[in-house]
Amino acid sequence: MKPLLCSLLLLSACAGPSEPQASGAGPAQTPPPVTVPMTPPSKKPALSAVQHWGVQLTGYGQTRLNAVHTSPFELVVVDPFDDDGTPWPAAEVRAAAQGRWLIAYLSMGAAESYRSYWQKGWKVGAPAWLLNEDPDWPGNFDVAYWDPAWQAIALAQLDRVIAQGFDGVYMDLIDAYQRHDNRPGARAEMVAWVCKIAAHARAQNPQFVIIPQNAAELIRDPGYAACVDASGNEETYVYAANRPTEAARQRELLASYRLWQQAGKPVFTIEYANQPALMKSAAERARAAGLIPYVGERSLDKLILNQP
């Protein structure tokens, strides 16, 4: 799966052609739409009680995190840096986190050339853990996520997020193990990496929340469930953008989601759509399956408050 965050310097919305929705993929009965309350929550709920969430990874502008602070969402994922690449001060993080879970986005399975850790002269193969550049996402590079050198860099980013006061981390590119078919232990190494991240964070803050994005199937692997608190997933019902997913994909993902739910862990979904009927259908189907949906633009440069 592609990285969730486009380069701050090369941000663009992705789009695709529309196609008819696969037949037989929806529930027999559709529940009424759920309206997001338009007032900020007064008290942070238990993670398992979150019903509305959102994501904004850039486009903060002069109002900074104010849109998050005044939003009705009980959980919001933001980039740990402002639009200028400066880490959010702890005071701003505390203010935005009032009444909600404020979660920091980090790419733990890929390197980004626009991040502060990137060094001049780096290129594919130098350092050794830096692998191919993603042709669809300039500035994003596969990494040997099992390499201790990369892990040290990523954990330093995690330390900064914890120091800023975030409630948890939303980890992108956990499904990167799927790109290493020639490495027999790639899946187990990703599970070990996620659990290492969790142990590192919880040693500093036992309440720190670990939310991997995608790779929901890893819940089947021994030990993984104990390391994570919730699952975040892109494109369950709609590909970016406005392109319904196949019924087979939906069945496969929903089977994994049920295992998360049986383990008592919430499943957050994000769909990239701006056609009202498709937005409504995706959100309703997600809620009927016990999921917590968010529907937004692929650019993720603003919070979409008017959720279906």
Swiss-Prot record:
PANTHER family: PELA, PTHR35882:SF1
The protein, known as: Uncharacterized protein DR_0705
Biased composition (Pro residues): 29-43
Region described as Disordered: spans on this chain: 19-43
SUPFAM superfamilies documented for this protein: (Trans)glycosidases
Pfam families assigned: Glyco_hydro_114
Gene3D superfamilies, per database record: Aldolase class I
